[in-house]
Amino acid sequence: MISAAWFGYPAEELTTIAVTGTKGKTTTTYMVKSLLEEAGHKVGVIGTIEVVIGQEHIPVNNTTPESYDIHSYFRKMAEEDCDVVVMEASSQGFKLDRTAGIMFDYGLFTNLSPDHIGPNEHKDFAEYLSCKAKLFNQCRYGYANIDDEHFAEITKNATCPIETFGLNENADLVAYDVELTRDRDFLGVDFGLKGTCEGKISCGVPGTFNVHNALGAISIAGHMGVTVEQMNKALRHFSVKGRVQIVPTGYDYTLIIDYAHNAVALESILNTLRAYDPPRLISLFGCGGNRSKLRRYEMGEVSGKLADFTIITSDNPRFEEPQAIIDDILIGMKKTDGEYISIIDRHEAISYALHHAQPGDIVVLAGKGHETYQEIEGKKYHMSEEEIVQDVLDGKY
């Protein structure tokens, strides 16, 4: 509240939109941005990857910044003639009251699954859920995924009207006739809309999972007057850096960079890509050092079960030995019949993946996503997977 007053209550000069959920926050946030910009709005973003104010892109470390920073960003956005801000609202942000005192115009809930539970985050799933549910006590209009198993718990104490979206016929906005579409450097999904919006949508983000992200964004955009024609223009070629990001290679396989860095996210993307029925699905990933060992076992087992071939490599080893992390991943991998190879150096691992990809394959580089560094022994070294891919294609690896 003090921060809001200090900056002259800038939130009152903007249409404020908050997106919360375990998965899909970033994708949905940028979908909302694209949809509203197609209709002529100037949209600021406060997200996991960055803060966007006009042409300025500011890298960030926390999903939800401190209260002072949020209102500082709001003020800069208002001064840059933004009329809308979309922000990712994390459970930690609600727990630590970083968004206290902001009455969002629109609040959007994507989904909920166990994550961020531990000594430095939430003590248990019940606390995690209750923090997410705070959004619907802090907005004027709420939008929620009716297909999520925790929908009823998330919305039961809402103090705002809730509009629903999903594949469920009882939703206010329903997607139907969902169809996956594929070309060499394109994976997408088409679907019809009925309810609060009517028409056909072609979305350039892979998987039925992203139908829910699109529906959430469309719900808000429709409320703000965006037409179905404008929605299609925005979504057909939509992409978010490091989130199921297709990287063109010029070859007859599909290469994807994705931020999936835990078992839930890896399982989700591998199932999503398997639905496109590739001859082979190749998964490349590592796990962060000085983090939960359980995550390593789980990710190894998930990839072993769901990918045709796994390349186990380094992520951010931090202060651990990369080989020790790989050995932990192998404990999970060896519970399965999955084929694998381990290559410690991530550059070499990516080179191996591209040189061994065959026509029709889908190759996913998981874990790093938008990150452009590798953290080793307390130092962050520059490492961009897009640049590595280009180097491989240019024959440097």
Briefly describe each language-model feature range.
Residues 1-146, 150-158:
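Phosphate-binding loop of NTP-binding sites
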Residues 14, 78-80, 95, 105-255, ...:
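Acidic, Mg2+-coordinating active-site environments of NTP-dependent enzymes
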Residues 25-31, 89, 93-94, 211-214, ...:
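Short glycine/serine/threonine-rich phosphate/pyrophosphate-binding segments
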Residues 46, 110, 145, 165-167, ...:
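Generic beta-sheet signal
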Residues 47-50, 111, 193-195, 367-369:
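Short, small-residue-rich loop/turn micro-motifs
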Residues 50-53, 114-118, 170-175, 318-319, ...:
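Short gly/pro/ser/thr-enriched loop/turn and capping motifs at secondary-structure boundaries
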Residues 84, 105-106, 216, 358-364:
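Short SAM/SAH-binding signature in class I
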Residues 159, 196, 219-233, 239-240, ...:
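ATP-dependent carboxylate-amine ligase
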